[in-house]
Amino acid sequence: MRYTIITLGIIVIGIGIVLSKQWITVFYGIPVWKNSSVQAFCMTPTTSLWATTNCIPDDHDYTEVPLNITEPFEAWGDRNPLIAQAASNIHLLFEQTMKPCVKLSPLCIKMNCVELNSTRERATTPTTTPKSTGLPCVGPTSGENLQSCNASIIEREMEDEPASNCTFAMAGYVRDQKKNYYSVVWNDAEIYCKNKTNSTSKECYMIHCNDSVIKEACDKTYWDQLRLRYCAPAGYALLKCNDEDYNGYKQNCSNVSVVHCTGLMNTTVTTGLLLNGSYHENRTQIWQKHRVNNNTVLILFNKHYNLSVTCRRPGNKTVLPVTIMAGLVFHSQKYNMKLRQAWCHFEGNWRGAWREVKQKIVELPKDRYKGTNNTEHIYLQRQWGDPEASNLWFNCQGEFFYCKMDWFLNYLNNKTWDAYHNFCSSKKKGHAPGPCVQRTYVAYHIRSVINDSYTLSKKTYAPPREGHLQCRSTVTGMTVELNYNSKNRTNVTLSPQIESIWAAELGRYKLVEITPIGFAPTEVRRYTGGHERQKRVPFVLGFLGFLGAAGTAMGAAASSLTVQSRHLLAGILQQQKNLLAAVEAQQQMLKLTIWGVKNLNARVTALEKYLEDQARLNSWGCAWKQVCHTTVEWPWTNRTPDWQNMTWLEWERQIADLESNITGQLVKAREQEEKNLDAYQKLTSWSDFWSWFDFSKWLNILKMGFLVIVGIIGLRLLYTVYGCIVRVRQGYVPLSPQIHIHQVGKGRPDNADEPGEGGDNSRIKLESWXKDSKSRCMQLTAWLTRLNTWLYNSCLTLLIQLRKAFQYLQYGLAELKTGAQEILQTLAGVAQNACHQIWLACRSAYRNIVNSPRRVRQGLEEILN
């Protein structure tokens, strides 16, 4: 009995040791991701030529799948690659649409210019009756509607632009003929002059002549109405933060959803104000870069105030083509003191919006704002520097507008001062009012030479187009800097940082890469289950449904890996079809543009990612498996997942530092498994078994044996010859201790009685050599006998020990069998007794039920009798 208990204990301990071990298991289809900077592609509902050749058609799918997770978000390009992509891509759009194509280098010559007088071309715009004789625009809020403005009064208040009529000479069509003289009208801001000959004539050059390459746009093109969406390639996704208190930076956004594409975003490039953007909330928001940076601040207006700006160019401008030489035509314009001037009117409750902005600024936390808390000491001012920075700059119908914002800023601040914040009287500058006035409209200037801040270069475009120009834009925000050198005053300075536009549009999104391969320890060493039939699940949410389980526990998510992996593959295939259709359309029109190449790159990236995942699974022996058990032991006992409460995302972040080690062990285990499988197949191969009956194989074996025997004999002969040579050279053989030595008399030489020979030494040497060889053979025979005896005893002892072990094992199995039989007998007895008791109880209940009428009858009879 004691041995039985010991045996059972050993077996239980062994089973416990085996079950306590955990093995690495590979899961495919888990909802896990990591931040990515892969190139996104675009969708657009616009049907223009540029849109159809650069973006795929919009599918109008705005499905959002909520995730029960927390995720960090950042709205600026240095930490959000999607914002950096937008800045680069919109610049490419800008370059492609407004691409200069005619070199202006022939005009980098000396020109004789004469300043034009102040005779002004009258505007042809019909006038309206002003509602007030004091201001051009009147209304409840000093001109909230453009219809309340007198266009004639506004145009008369516009300052004259100094211009010059310049003449220059060139060879013309035939180079050996006399030079032709041409006359061109230039704005004084686009030329620089020297060596004035008199008060009116001067020598001038174009302002861009110091630059290396300057080109002029052939055609006027623009994209005022173009809106697009950024979409993640297959195998990637976009996460969106929906928290109401999101301000461009949040470490733990709790209301997170996954989307395939962003919302429609605006592509209007501006400085200072955000035009035609998207409204997020019905309230004013202040976003600061990295939460505490006051040099990059984004203010999003409340849509309740209905802010907008309407720009128009008065008059009918005529562009004159000047043929310089064959194949080179330059565009000039008529003499006019308002060559490039326009005006814009700001509509809506701007003062109410500005009051709410100031209130939001003083409500900022102390770690984000340390300026004054008095809203009366917060002022809005413009920037200094390049024209694009000091003015409100944007593109309207292909023309570049530069707005001097002093009048409008005075209106918002309700102050009367100049650009240097010096109080002054509203004196007129000629027919135009001075800088110290309050207006809801400002003067715009159209420029042809602009500064490209993205490439740090200059670009020259054609003069303004003919006809009437007008465009209306909604104002959704502004980019500013918060400057407070003292606590008595805070300056809100308009900023030319274009990147903030895309931060406002895409700041709630982040691009992530789906990593569907995960590792976790399980008690199963290898996959032993049979084939299970799996239900086909319809793709209700497609690719987004794959990430819907991101917030669920690991155990629940692992149970639906098959469906999730199908969602992943279905989303990849659908996106590939859409991208391929767009690329084919671009190929047919021979317009594979820069963005078309990006779309093609997104398609290739998705295929590469999917093939890379499958290649990794195949290298571990887990190809096309959702759950793959391996033979690699999990060595990190202090890291185990909580299958009921932990998500896959949390678990993968815990073991991120172990991934390279895990993958290396899986690859080594797979290689060893393949080697073992190859060796096993060779052992179990029937071709190898029947090869033993091949006569040629036996001949080879005999040949090898014969060669071995010949080699041994040859070595023995060489050894014998070598020994003989050594003995001959020595001249004697040492006497063996076994040879008897005859005793001779003292002083008597050997064989002294026999005359003649000098003794019998040769015969004695030969006999001793033969006896020595015989003794060596006897020693070898004795050694072999002892070796044989030792081998026999060892084998006998081993067999005895094995027999004893087998007897112990047989005895233990017999005891286990006896114990199992006793347990079964006991269980059978208990079951029999239980069944018998149940039978008795049922029979008693049945009898009681059956006998109830009889007993009732008997009771009634007794009562009645």
Swiss-Prot record:
InterPro entries: Gp120_core_sf, GP41-like, HIV1_Gp120. The record marks X770 as: In-frame UAG termination codon. Residues 487-494 are annotated as: V5. Keywords: Apoptosis, Cleavage on pair of basic residues, Coiled coil, Disulfide bond, Fusion of virus membrane with host membrane, Glycoprotein, Host cell membrane, Host endosome, Host membrane, Host-virus interaction, Membrane, Signal, Transmembrane, Transmembrane helix, Viral attachment to host cell, Viral envelope protein, Viral penetration into host cytoplasm, Virion, Virus entry into host cell. The record marks R536, V537 as: Cleavage. Residues 727-865 are cytoplasmic. Disulfide bonds join C42-C55, C101-C218, C108-C209, C113-C166, C231-C261, C241-C253, C311-C344, C396-C471. Residues 1-20 form the signal peptide. Residues 403-444 are annotated as: V4. One of its GO terms (cellular component) is membrane. It comes from the Viruses. The surface protein gp120 (SU) attaches the virus to the host lymphoid cell by binding to the primary receptor CD4. This interaction induces a structural rearrangement creating a high affinity binding site for a chemokine coreceptor like CCR5. This peculiar 2 stage receptor-interaction strategy allows gp120 to maintain the highly conserved coreceptor-binding site in a cryptic conformation, protected from neutralizing antibodies. These changes are transmitted to the transmembrane protein gp41 and are thought to activate its fusogenic potential by unmasking its fusion peptide. Surface protein gp120 (SU) may target the virus to gut-associated lymphoid tissue (GALT) by binding host ITGA4/ITGB7 (alpha-4/beta-7 integrins), a complex that mediates T-cell migration to the GALT. Interaction between gp120 and ITGA4/ITGB7 would allow the virus to enter GALT early in the infection, infecting and killing most of GALT's resting CD4+ T-cells. This T-cell depletion is believed to be the major insult to the host immune system leading to AIDS. This is Envelope glycoprotein gp160. It comes from Simian immunodeficiency virus agm.vervet (isolate AGM TYO-1) (SIV-agm.ver). The lineage of its organism: Viruses, Riboviria, Pararnavirae, Artverviricota, Revtraviricetes.
